[in-house]
C-alpha cells in the first residue's frame, strides 16, 4: 500500500510540473471527427532553413539580393508529378523585424515528403507587373495551394505593400509559371472590400481516388478565410470570390476567438479544409492572449494548431471545435527565432502515399513537417 501511495504521489507531482507549450505531455481523448495523432518524424525537422548562399536578381530593386538569408517559414504544399511540392515564404536580409523585409516564395520538392530539394531562386515574388503597387516592397506572404481535378493549381497568398494586407489569387498548371489575378475580393459588392484587411484562405477540398482536389458544394467553390476571425467566401471560377455578410452587411464571422482558450486572441485559417464523412474539417492557427483572457496552460502569445468541424451541407454552421490544440510548439526551433513565444503555424497539408503530411512555420523562422496516418487510431491531444 505504501508503494502504491508513493506511485500516486509521484504521478501527481509529475503532472504539477508540466509547463506550457513544449512541456511534457498529458493526454485526453479526441472526438471521432478530429485527426489527432500528427507525429514529428524523428531527426527530420526542420526541413527548410535560411540559406545565405543563394542570390536572386530582384526586378524591383534592380539588384542582386540574398532572398532567403533571414527566415524561411509558413509553407503551402501540394502534390505535382508524384512529388510533394512546398512553397515557403522566404525573407531577405534587407531589414530587421517581422513584416519589415521583402517576402518571396521559394520552391522545394520531395520524393518522400520529408527530404526536400530546393530551387536556388524564388518562383513567386514582387515584379514589375499589374500587382506591383500591392506587393512591393513587403512582398508575397503566407501561401496556400490547392488543385482542381483537371490540374489547375490555385494559390491564395497575402499581398503586402506595408500599408495594407490583401488576400490575392494566382493560378498555374506547372507550379513555376503563375498568373496573378489580384485581390480575391476585388469585384465583390462593387469593389467594396478591395482595400479591407484580408488574408489566410483555406479552400474546401476532398479526396477522390486518393487525390486531394478542390470540392464544390451546391455548385460553388467555398473557402474559409481570415485572421482575427473566420469568414466564408464562395466563387464560381476560383478567381473572383464573394465573402458572405451578416445582417449588418459586414463580414460573417463563423468562428471567433474564445476567452480562456488557446485561441483567445486569433483564429487564423490554415491549410485547405477537408470534406470528410463527418463534415468539413478546418485546420486553423490559434494565438493565445496573455493574462487572464488567455489559456494559462499555454505560453502567452504562442501559436498552436486547432481543428473545427463545419456542416457539409451548410459550411457556415460550426458543429464542434477542439478545446485544446492538437499540435503545439515543442522543439527549440519552434520556440526561438523571430517568434520566441512559440509558433507552429500550419499552412500546407497533402495526402501522399496514404498519409497526411502537415507543413508548418516554426517561430516565423524555419519549416517543419508532421505526419498523420489515418489507419492508426487517434491517441490523444498534447496537453501542456
Give each language-model segment a name.
Residues 21-74, 78-138, 146-265, 274-339, ...:
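Beta-rich carbohydrate-recognition and catalytic domains
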Residues 334-336, 344-347:
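Short glycine-rich, acidic/polar surface loops and turns
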Amino acid at each position: 500500500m505504501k508503494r502504491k501511495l508513493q506511485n500516486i504521489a509521484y504521478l501527481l507531482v509529475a503532472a504539477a510540473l508540466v509547463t506550457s507549450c513544449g512541456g511534457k505531455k498529458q493526454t485526453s481523448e479526441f472526438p471521432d471527427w478530429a485527426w489527432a495523432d500528427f507525429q514529428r518524424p524523428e531527426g527530420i525537422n526542420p526541413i527548410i532553413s535560411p540559406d545565405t548562399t543563394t542570390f536572386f536578381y530582384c526586378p524591383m530593386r534592380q539588384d542582386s539580393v540574398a532572398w532567403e538569408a533571414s527566415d524561411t517559414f509558413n509553407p503551402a504544399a501540394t502534390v505535382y508529378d508524384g512529388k510533394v511540392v512546398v512553397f515557403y515564404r522566404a525573407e531577405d536580409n534587407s531589414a530587421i523585424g517581422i513584416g519589415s523585409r521583402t517576402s518571396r516564395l521559394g520552391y522545394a520538392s520531395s520524393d518522400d515528403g520529408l527530404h526536400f530539394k530546393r530551387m536556388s531562386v524564388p518562383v513567386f515574388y514582387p515584379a514589375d507587373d499589374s500587382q506591383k503597387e500591392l506587393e512591393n516592397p513587403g512582398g508575397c506572404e503566407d501561401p496556400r495551394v490547392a488543385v482542381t481535378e483537371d490540374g489547375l493549381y490555385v494559390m491564395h497568398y497575402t499581398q503586402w505593400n506595408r500599408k495594407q494586407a490583401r488576400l490575392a489569387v494566382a493560378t498555374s498548371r506547372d507550379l513555376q509559371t503563375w498568373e496573378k489575378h489580384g485581390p480575391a475580393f476585388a469585384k465583390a459588392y462593387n469593389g467594396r472590400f478591395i482595400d479591407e484587411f484580408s488574408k489566410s484562405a483555406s479552400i474546401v477540398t476532398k479526396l477522390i481516388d486518393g487525390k486531394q482536389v478542390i470540392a464544390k458544394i451546391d455548385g460553388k467553390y467555398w473557402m474559409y478565410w481570415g485572421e482575427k476571425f473566420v469568414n466564408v467566401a464562395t466563387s464560381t471560377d476560383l478567381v473572383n470570390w464573394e465573402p458572405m455578410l451578416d445582417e449588418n452587411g459586414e463580414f460573417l464571422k463563423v468562428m471567433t476567438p474564445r476567452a480562456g482558450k488557446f485561441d483567445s486572441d486569433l483564429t487564423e485559417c490554415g491549410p485547405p479544409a477537408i470534406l470528410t464523412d463527418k463534415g468539413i474539417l478546418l485546420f486553423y492557427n490559434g494565438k493565445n492572449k496573455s493574462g487572464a483572457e488567455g489559456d494559462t496552460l499555454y505560453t502567452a502569445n504562442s501559436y498552436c494548431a486547432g481543428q473545427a468541424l463545419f456542416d457539409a451541407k451548410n459550411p457556415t454552421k460550426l458543429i464542434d471545435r477542439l478545446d485544446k490544440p492538437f499540435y503545439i510548439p515543442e522543439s527549440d526551433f519552434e520556440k526561438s527565432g523571430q517568434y520566441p513565444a512559440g509558433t507552429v503555424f500550419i499552412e500546407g497539408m497533402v495526402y501522399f502515399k496514404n498519409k497526411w503530411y502537415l507543413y508548418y512555420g516554426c517561430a516565423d523562422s524555419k519549416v517543419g513537417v508532421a505526419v498523420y496516418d489515418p489507419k492508426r487510431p487517434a491517441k490523444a491531444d498534447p496537453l501542456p
